[in-house]
Amino acid sequence: MENIHLIFKFLWYSILFCIWGVSCTSSGTYKKTQMDIYMQYYDFIIDSLSKNPNYVCTRTARQMSFTTDSVAYCHYLVLLAKAYMFKSEMDSAKLSMDRAEVFCDGAEPSPLINDLYAEIYNMRGNVCVRQGLTDSSVVCFQKAFDYRLKGSNRDMLHDISINLADAFVRTGHYDKGAMWYRKALSYCDSLKIPEEKRFPVYYGLAQVYMELRD
């Protein structure tokens, strides 16, 4: 039943997006890009990532077969890596990230490529966390943050800041953890993140202050 619901949801998104695209292109103001299609797909599929990673893998592989833009294709690869991680298939996740990174290494530097690097290193950091490689996770998250600053999409800076804070806390660097939690709060303010989504930051700060007090 869940898969049927997701299919109908995707069809509905597709119809709305096509109507919007036609109306915009007919007036000569907008033409749909492969990255637009990816972002539409990402918004549709992201809620299923933790609930049904098998479905995400299958559906994403199908989407990739229709993609002609290399940057969009690599974003699909990173999304595929996330799904593999939820399936605990770390080797497959690493392979997908490696393929995306090889493309980035050979591409002309640009904000879009920096966004892609940020996605890759944030994912690598998460994989390191799962494998208990705490110091390596700090390095990866720091690279993800630096690339995101040079990218075109800063909406995820608060998430990467939280990841960095968590990683520093795991290494026992509570002062650096507190600093990154405060940075995360600052980004939450600038991005107007709702209060109910800031709980990880408040919880992390509370834990750090308890550790520092002891």
Residue locations for each model-derived region?
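Bacterial N-terminal signal peptides
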Residues: L11-G21
